[in-house]
Amino acid sequence: MTDETPKTEVVQDPVSGAVVPAHPVGEETALRLTLTTPLYRGATIAMFLSGLGFSAAAPQIASFLVNDLGASLTVAGLYYLTALTAPVAGYLVGARSDRTGNRLGLFRLCALAGFLGWAGIAFSTQLWMPFVISAVVLGFAGAATSQLFAALHDQLAQTPRASNDGVVAIVRMALTAGWVIGPVAGAFLAAQTSARVMLFATALCTLAQILPLGALKDVPTSVPATAHGATAPAAPGVRVMAPLLVFTALYICVYAGESIKYAYLPIYMNDQLHLAPALSGAIIGIQPLVELVLMPVAVVVARRTGMMKPMIVAAGFGVAANLCFALTGTAAGLFAGQILMGGVWGVFAALGIIAAQRLLPVAVATASAIFLSSTALSSALGGLTGGLGAAAFGLPLVFLIPAGFAAIAVIGLILMARTKAARDL
């Protein structure tokens, strides 16, 4: 007798790795789950505030150093190197979080550090003060985001669902939405008041991250407590962390082009192509809009194909985008490049943090911190090679450098996809 019982289609939950039904009966959608779960809802609002505050200050800080504190353009440019302490601070916070399981407590401390840091910069009277504050205090403040994603992972892993990856994508989309609005809001506030007021507003946004989470506590995990004489788990060794470190290095190659693009694409559009300001603004602004649209699409595709294939394609988009910047010489070509870059970040923004946590499941806070803080290294790499490339090749051929970095990422991701660690993604 033939068994005609219908087979249930299954997928692998990218957060927990569990195999779950693709379309379970009564399954809550990711949006509904986010809205009805206090942690997910609070994390979404917190990440929007984080992106809003930081992106408001980032484009204005150099002008503040020059106009308010008397820095030269060269010295002001060196400020961005202070972010190089972020990976070290992020690793220390992440390792502490994995030993204790205290995700939300550390998140609140990091957010408080961010408030104190940005407020300190806003009230700085000497040029050295923002540099020291950024290197020491804001390095730890940046770990707030990684702790929140680690807390999300812990709760999502408690109940494997096909919609879990969608929850992470929604929270990540909120961070991106903050980055879309922040630069405009920051420029407007600075113009209407002053750079110091805008920087203090950034401090308030950073502190306000704490409010949506209220008094929520961490979800109990298998991490043993260190109190009462219990032995803390050993930090993962380099060999265990190797897949994560390789993936992060390839991500740095993809991301390095962003600092080059934002430094030289506006100059290229204004000084050589002589594009109208409105057209230049539209070219810059199209990328985050495409990114927001494609993030949920990337999640759906990854459920069917695994994460590596979309990320390989996205890195390929990075190659094509930078070739458009370097070789087309037209507004249409730059639009195409920015749309392709939206595809790059639509995929990596949605899937990158999940992949990083899956590559080091024994220490998800450490994994989150290493991955998210790596943008500081990529910005430094892009700034250094972009400066040398602009001097050697000029504009627009400097964009061949990030095209080369993205090509390295494509090759590396293809090779990594063949490893056991990546096949499980």
Describe the function of each predicted region.
Residues G26-L84, S259-Q272:
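Helix-loop boundary and gating motifs at the non-cytosolic
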Residues L294, M308-G352:
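C-terminal transmembrane helical hairpin of 12-TM major facilitator-type secondary transporters
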Residues G105-A119, F200-A203, K309-C324, A403:
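Structural signature of the two symmetry-related core transmembrane helices
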Residues A89-N102, A190, L294-M307, A390:
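Helix-to-loop junctions at the C-terminal end of transmembrane segments
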Residues V362-F393:
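A late C-terminal transmembrane helix in Major Facilitator Superfamily
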Residues V136-M173:
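Cytoplasmic helix-loop-helix junction between adjacent transmembrane helices
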Residues F48, W128-T145, I252, G333-V347:
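Hydrophobic core of transmembrane alpha-helices in multi-pass small-molecule transporters
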Residues G77-A95, G285-V297:
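Central cavity-lining transmembrane alpha-helices of secondary-active solute carriers
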